[in-house]
Amino acid sequence: MKPLSSPLQQYWQTVVERLPEPLADESLSAQAKSVLTFSDFVQDSVIAHPEWLTELESQPPQADEWQHYSAWWQEALSNVSDEAGLMRELRLFRRRIMVRIAWAQTLALVTEESILLQLSHLAETLIVAARDWLYDACCREWGTPCNAQGEAQPLLILGMGKLGGGELNFSSDIDLIFAWPEHGCTQGGRRELDNAQFFTRMGQRLIKVLDQPTQDGFVYRVDMRLRPFGESGPLVLSFAALEDYYQEQGRDWERYAMVKARIMGDSEGVYANELRAMLRPFVFRRYIDFSVIQSLRNMKGMIAREVRRRGLTDNIKLGAGGIREIEFIVQVFQLIRGGREPSLQSRSLLPTLSAIAELHLLSENDAEQLRVAYLFLRRLENLLQSINDEQTQTLPSDELNRARLAWAMDFADWQQLTGALIGHMTNVRRVFNELIGDDESETQEESLSEQWRELWQDALQEDDTTPVLAHLSEDDRKQVLTLIADFRKELDKRTIGPRGRQVLDHLMPHLLRDVCTREDAAVTLSRITALLVGIVTRTTYLELLSEFPAALKHLISLCAASPMIASQLARYPLLLDELLDPNTLYQPTATDAYRDELRQYLLRVPEDDEEQQLEALRQFKQAQLLRIAAADIAGTLPVMKVSDHLTWLAEAMIDAVVQQAWVQMVARYGKPNHLNEREGRGFAVVGYGKLGGWELGYSSDLDLIFLHDCPMDAMTDGEREIDGRQFYLRLAQRIMHLFSTRTSSGILYEVDARLRPSGAAGMLVTSAEAFADYQKNEAWTWEHQALVRARVVYGDPQLTAHFDAVRREIMTLPREGKTLQTEVREMREKMRAHLGNKHRDRFDIKADEGGITDIEFITQYLVLRYAHEKPKLTRWSDNVRILELLAQNDIMEEQEAMALTRAYTTLRDELHHLALQELPGHVPEDCFTAEREQVRVSWQKWLVEE
């Protein structure tokens, strides 16, 4: 045995300090010192189980000891009485045997072929042991699964990949497929289960027993994604379902995977032979199958691009000339000629490589170089993984692990090891390139596009996605891969024609490239895939995004910035047309042009087609809302302007809705006859709250009341004559209907008409005289407060003037200051008790103390308190200009008015942005402390102090 190198002798002193007294004395053999210095995994294991080291020294590992694993397991099984005990013993047995394998491997006591065999046989022993124990337990619990003839049905397990080939890594996942022979039901249990239920439950428990980490670790990481339909498919399939899948839907990569498939355990039983015979025609075609060459060429191109992308010279699996390329070379011949040449049907690589040479498919020299390279790389891979029982194929960058590998591979130093490694990998790459021709040269753009195409088509192995998504955290990377997989599953449920598939396959690599290179890739992708699910069957929209890269770019940036926009686009894909022109997308309609724009838009729709009119109104509103939000996100609209645009848009919609309702009512009943001698409609819509105060948000509803000036004796002049006031009531009802009717484009606005005289108990529409009388004689103080933020948003000039006069008269009434202060304060306290402090350790921007509603109450109180002396205070209905008026009229100091204005606009701005993020209107308790303090000081000054 080669002595430890100088760096490892130094490290041995560190190891000694870790070892407990009995292990640290001079009695340790040179072999033990070498292995404990090389492998932290062995070191940790024998510290926890010193008896294992004694066993290793007295009974060193042998090449053929894998033949005893089953007997040794039977001894361990005597300690098992329940599932928890099974999990514990499996984990301890696996660790004990892995220590023995690591010992033999480090000291080169057995050949590398023996190491691979031992690792694979250990896994098979434990998989079969767990399956058999659980089968008995499940039969006791649910009865024995039987076919129609009453014959017991077993669970068969296909070991895939390196497990199937008897070439398992030291630290490796295991790829499994579960199957059972025939349908039927359980017999002998308390209640009957069909076989599918039985084996699915048993399969779930088997995965848990092997895969679930406990204080003793895990047995193996179990990967079931190679089964038919992958993660979306059943966990366990009947033979009939397997056969149907592979005959009808099996793909080339599944043939590639199935080459190594091996039945675990009793592989010579009747059912095992049946399964094997069923799968063979899928894997090995009877004829020489050159049809597979193109897909093999694609696989080769994938690997080559992966190498170019990252320069993976330090990855002995993925790198140019690495293990994967050797496996690929061998399987090329198996897939093309395996049906005609039984000697090529071996699951293991080295026997197949020998057969390839004997058939003169490769020269003896090339085959020998591949054999030597394979054994060299597999030994290096297993040594690397046995240092920490860690699943890695990347060569270390630290000096200690480099020294360990150089010593174990029998080289003087790291430089000598890497020199030999490069030689072997160069030989592999040469054969690899000669096999189906070198890659055609491709531009950087083509190469870049290809990696995203592979990500979209699920052609990358999980460890291959790192270069593409390297900038993302591990969690985000997993989330992105899950989102892509889930989206593909969703597509499988939809009827997408060949043209749609083609467009999608062209679009998705570009979309993934643009989304996944962002830091917020996972969030953005989740929003966009939700949108795409809604339009995948509508190829026109896919083509729009595919053929107009700028539209795709705008879609991504808007969805990244706002889930609200993403939701709107998902619900109403017609809006995607708005993405085509950035000049209009980020430039909302001029505030005074909304009415004209809407009028022009509605001219496209027949006036007598009510359904299309309703759709057109909603589509116009959504398109304008999108443009406002886009400009808000782009930073071209400050908060005040956002509300201005939203308010002007709402007024344009009110105008159009009243127009439609009026035309429909007049067509049915004629006009009220009091209008014959005058212009106008004798009708007004008053906006309260956010609409009245020019402060609408993205999801604000509309607070409206309806007024008319119809005399008591007026009648309509149509064929269906009705009372004039009844006409206006039906007009108001029609307006409410047009706003609230849900079409495929949703509703227009939520409308709240409860601020009308007598609230919900009052008439929906009120005469101007009755409104004035109510305000003067019946209205509460809070209704006068609401009037501060009220204005006519639609109406005849004379009705508008009448409302303005009533509003001014009410607001300028003399009021006793103390009484008003008490009433306003108590109303606010009631509201706060009802609405505020709902969220522990959060600040509700609108409802909590120091928030927006407090500012609104301060301005309303001051207008009602001082308008009698300063009538100019009644001019505006929005808080910002009211605060300006209070300063100009010497009610409030300018500094305080400006501070409250800043607080108000800051809080409003935050509400807008929370709405864009579809988040509720509350923030952490420590936010906006300065603004809230200013509001509290002003509240105390005006509404508490004498």
UniProtKB/Swiss-Prot annotation:
Source superkingdom: Bacteria
Stored SUPFAM superfamilies: Nucleotidyltransferase (SSF81301), Nucleotidyltransferase substrate binding subunit/domain (SSF81593)
Keyword Flavoprotein: no
E.C. designation(s): 2.7.7.89, 2.7.7.42
Keyword list, A-Z: ATP-binding, Magnesium, Multifunctional enzyme, Nucleotide-binding, Nucleotidyltransferase, Transferase
Record's GO cellular component terms: cytosol
Matches recorded under Gene3D superfamilies: 1.20.120.1510, Beta Polymerase, domain 2, Glutamine synthase adenylyltransferase GlnE, Nucleotidyltransferases domain 2
A Pfam family that the UniProt record links to this protein: GlnD_UR_UTase
Names of the cofactor(s): Mg(2+)
Region feature Adenylyl removase, mapped onto this chain: 1-440
Catalytic reaction(s) noted: [glutamine synthetase]-O(4)-(5'-adenylyl)-L-tyrosine + phosphate = [glutamine synthetase]-L-tyrosine + ADP; [glutamine synthetase]-L-tyrosine + ATP = [glutamine synthetase]-O(4)-(5'-adenylyl)-L-tyrosine + diphosphate
Region of interest called Adenylyl transferase, as start-end residue ranges on this chain: 449-946
Record bears the keyword 4Fe-4S: no
Transmembrane region(s): none
GO molecular function: [glutamate-ammonia-ligase] adenylyltransferase activity; [glutamine synthetase]-adenylyl-L-tyrosine phosphorylase activity; ATP binding; magnesium ion binding
GO biological processes: regulation of glutamine family amino acid metabolic process
NCBIfam families: PRK11072.1
Similarity section: Belongs to the GlnE family.
Function comment: Involved in the regulation of glutamine synthetase GlnA, a key enzyme in the process to assimilate ammonia. When cellular nitrogen levels are high, the C-terminal adenylyl transferase (AT) inactivates GlnA by covalent transfer of an adenylyl group from ATP to specific tyrosine residue of GlnA, thus reducing its activity. Conversely, when nitrogen levels are low, the N-terminal adenylyl removase (AR) activates GlnA by removing the adenylyl group by phosphorolysis, increasing its activity.
Protein name (record): Bifunctional glutamine synthetase adenylyltransferase/adenylyl-removing enzyme
